[in-house]
């Protein structure tokens, strides 16, 4: 049976994985090419038995592909898992999209469980968004002047590239899974191309609730309900969503260490808001840090991936740094789509009527994302006679697919089985 190794590290061991200055310097000098980033991705994928020794797997064929969608800077990077015996033809498709600034390699703990016994009916695609991961990094040149124009143009950058990729693969309809910002963009894709999405699985999606701090500069102006929320928030501001993403450890999210209570924080400092509005991303700061970059990032990675065994941790750290270091591209979408603090400039909640397919919301029980908004969206969809479900995954944070792959996989596999039963009944 293919497995991914799991180990629990002590706090002392976890701290030992922060890099020395010498290690940081060496990695900085090495991590400056697309080939290095792909090599690091291979090292992550090869921690999975059936991928590392794919020739021995009797069922699944693993292909790493760069699909050309545009003439210039238009390669979309993917891992496809299909059936060795029958190939890809006449199969249904399930497509997994990663979150902001990440890459398809983040799904490495899910690839075995999500594809074993599935390839006879489904081709599984793990895809890097254009401008992220190991896909091409075209210039991100948004010409819109108003916030609304920037949102629309930025959303089209992602949805049109995904649609062009779909057409190139001859996929008629797909189950679409998206995490965080990838969930937001997947939802927008489903709104723009409803006939192409069979089901929508949103994994801790950003941009669901209204922005209580919205102003006339944003794509939508806050209403009276959101306005009242401002006062509630300002009475006792919660820990910043963005801050939580940096500070939460994997021990906390997986239940191996008690969660620290959130401490009230003031709204984001003005200089952070200024940097956000100027599209200064975390990755641009990482690039500017030069030889210190890998060491600085190791403070984050040693916390975020703190329960993984040493070799897996190192592979994932190297992978993250290698793709973060590549030329900036669609990472600059952040400030166009989200206001400072990670609220949407144009939220999904106010566009739910455009969704036409069964929609699943998933959150970790220690998620910093607003799962209550996901529950409200679920209820609103049901009121519109759209099938919807809301799931909380135990012992997991924002990256619930990574923290608790077994429970996450089971929810996805349930939806796959339901689709197969529905398809069989229609065929009969």
Curated annotation (Swiss-Prot):
Q: Where is this motif: GXSXG lipase motif?
A: 178-182
Q: Which family does it belong to?
A: Belongs to the peptidase S33 family. ABHD4/ABHD5 subfamily.
- For the motif HXXXXD motif, give the residue ranges: 398-403
Lineage: superkingdom: Eukaryota
Query: Which GO molecular function, any one, fits this protein according to its record?
Result: carboxylic ester hydrolase activity
What PANTHER family does the record tag this protein with?
A: PUMMELIG, ISOFORM A, RE40534P-RELATED
Q: What is this protein called?
A: Probable cardiolipin-specific deacylase 1, mitochondrial
Q: What EC designation does it have?
A: 3.5.1.-
Which keywords label this protein? Hydrolase, Membrane, Mitochondrion, Mitochondrion inner membrane, Transit peptide
Q: How does it sit in the membrane?
A: Peripheral membrane protein
User: Where does the UniProt annotation locate this protein?
Assistant: Mitochondrion; Mitochondrion inner membrane
Q: Which Pfam families match?
A: Abhydrolase_1
**Residue ranges annotated as motif HXXXXD acyl transferase motif:** 398-403
Q: Which InterPro entries match?
A: AB_hydrolase_1, AB_hydrolase_fold
Which GO BP terms, alphabetically?
cardiolipin acyl-chain remodeling; lipid homeostasis; phosphatidic acid biosynthetic process
Catalysed reaction equations from the record: a cardiolipin + H2O = 1'-[1,2-diacyl-sn-glycero-3-phospho],3'-[1-acyl-sn-glycero-3-phospho]-glycerol + a fatty acid + H(+)
The record's note on quaternary structure and interaction partners says: Monomer.
**Keyword Glycoprotein included in the entry's annotation:** no
Q: What does this protein do?
A: Mitochondrial cardiolipin-specific phospholipase which deacylates de novo synthesized cardiolipin (CL). Part of the remodeling process of cardiolipin, which involves deacylation-reacylation of premature cardiolipin.
Please tell me where this protein is predominantly located.
mitochondrion
Q: Which GO terms describe its cellular component?
A: cytoplasm; endoplasmic reticulum; Golgi apparatus; mitochondrial inner membrane; mitochondrion
Annotated AB hydrolase-1 domain ranges read: 93-217
| Catalytic center residues | 180, 367, 398
Q: What class of enzyme is it?
A: hydrolase
Domain comment in the entry: The HXXXXD motif is essential for acyltransferase activity.
């Amino acid at each position: 049976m293919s497995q991914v190794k799991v180990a629990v590290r002590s706090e002392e061991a976890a701290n030992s994985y922060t890099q020395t200055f010498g290690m940081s310097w060496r990695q900085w000098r090495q991590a400056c090419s697309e080939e290095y980033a792909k090599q690091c991705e291979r090292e992550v994928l090869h921690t999975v038995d059936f991928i590392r020794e794919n020739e021995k797997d009797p069922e699944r064929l693993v292909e790493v592909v760069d699909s050309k969608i545009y003439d210039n800077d238009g390669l979309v990077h993917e891992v496809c898992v299909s059936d060795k015996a029958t190939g890809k033809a006449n199969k249904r498709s399930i497509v997994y999209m990663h979150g902001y600034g990440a890459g398809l390699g983040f799904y490495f703990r899910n690839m075995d469980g999500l594809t074993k016994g599935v390839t006879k009916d489904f081709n599984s695609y793990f895809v890097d968004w254009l401008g992220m991961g190991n896909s091409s990094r075209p210039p991100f040149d948004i010409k819109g002047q108003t916030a609304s124009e920037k949102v629309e143009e930025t959303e089209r950058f992602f949805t049109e590239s995904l649609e062009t990729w779909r057409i190139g693969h001859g996929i008629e309809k797909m189950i679409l899974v998206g995490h965080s910002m990838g969930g937001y963009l997947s939802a927008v894709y489903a709104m723009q191309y409803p006939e192409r999405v069979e089901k929508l699985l949103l994994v801790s999606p950003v941009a669901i609730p209204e922005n209580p701090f919205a102003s006339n500069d944003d794509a939508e102006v806050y209403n009276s309900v959101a306005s009242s929320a401002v006062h509630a928030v300002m009475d006792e501001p919660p820990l910043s969503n963005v801050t939580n993403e940096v500070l939460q450890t994997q021990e906390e999210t997986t239940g191996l260490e008690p969660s620290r209570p959130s401490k009230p924080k003031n709204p984001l400092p003005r200089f952070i808001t200024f940097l956000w509005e100027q599209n200064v991303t975390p990755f641009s700061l990482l690039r500017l840090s030069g030889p210190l970059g890998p060491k600085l990032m190791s403070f984050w990675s040693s916390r975020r991936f703190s329960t993984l065994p040493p070799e897996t941790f190192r592979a994932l750290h190297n992978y993250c740094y290698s793709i973060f270091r590549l030329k900036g591209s669609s990472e600059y979408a952040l400030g166009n789509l989200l206001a400072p603090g990670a609220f949407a400039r144009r939220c999904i909640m106010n566009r739910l009527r455009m969704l036409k397919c069964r929609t699943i919301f998933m959150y970790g029980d220690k998620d910093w994302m607003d799962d209550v908004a996901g529950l409200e969206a679920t209820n609103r969809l049901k009121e519109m006679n759209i099938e919807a479900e809301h799931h909380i995954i135990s012992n997991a944070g924002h990256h619930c697919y990574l923290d608790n792959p077994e429970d996450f996989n089971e929810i996805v596999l349930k939806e796959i089985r339901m689709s197969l039963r529905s398809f069989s009944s229609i065929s009969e």
